[in-house]
Design a protein with these regions (language model features):
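Solvent-exposed beta-strand/loop surfaces of large extracellular or lumenal domains
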Residues: 81-110
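Conserved small/polar residues in nucleotide/adenosyl-binding loops
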Residues: 139-146
Length: 146
């Protein structure tokens, strides 16, 4: 009979916080796409790329990727057709933590609370989003051998 040993690491929640940021930018419709007649649907996804901790602050870097479906009308034809446009907005935000989390394991969940894409004119859109960041810090207690 063989005895197998494993290390079990125990982590405890040290601090968590919630912060909301607003992202706002204008984008031009590429020349290869038709003019915007009517925006049908917009959707987006936010992800964090990195979380760096410096004492009681977490520097969160990430990006918001968005897409929209609109009815486009080209100048050379009377026909309207659906067109998809995508883009992304990068962000870097410093979030205050509730304690000194230097050396701890920190993760950050991000979610979109609101996404609004409006046509400024037929060749330009305005993208506004409210993003919620939830950095969570875990401290390493010990390793058990079983």
């Amino acid at each position: 009979m063989r005895l197998r040993t494993e290390n079990i690491h125990e982590y405890r929640l040290k601090c968590n916080t919630v912060a909301q940021i607003t992202l706002d930018d204008d984008f031009n419709v590429p020349d290869t796409k038709d003019d915007i007649e009517l925006i049908v649907k917009e959707w987006g996804n936010v992800q964090t790329d990195s979380v760096k901790v410096n004492k009681d602050k977490a520097a969160v870097d990430g990006e918001l990727k968005f897409s929209l479906l609109y009815i486009g009308a080209s100048s050379d034809s009377e026909r309207m057709q659906p067109v998809k446009m995508t883009g992304k907005m990068s962000f870097s935000e410093n979030v205050n933590l509730s304690g000194d989390c230097t050396g701890d394991y920190v993760t950050c969940q991000a979610s979109i609370e609101d996404l609004s894409i409006k046509a400024i004119n037929s060749r330009k859109i305005s993208v506004k989003a409210i993003v919620t960041l939830k950095p969570v810090s875990y401290t390493h207690l010990r390793a058990h051998e079983t």
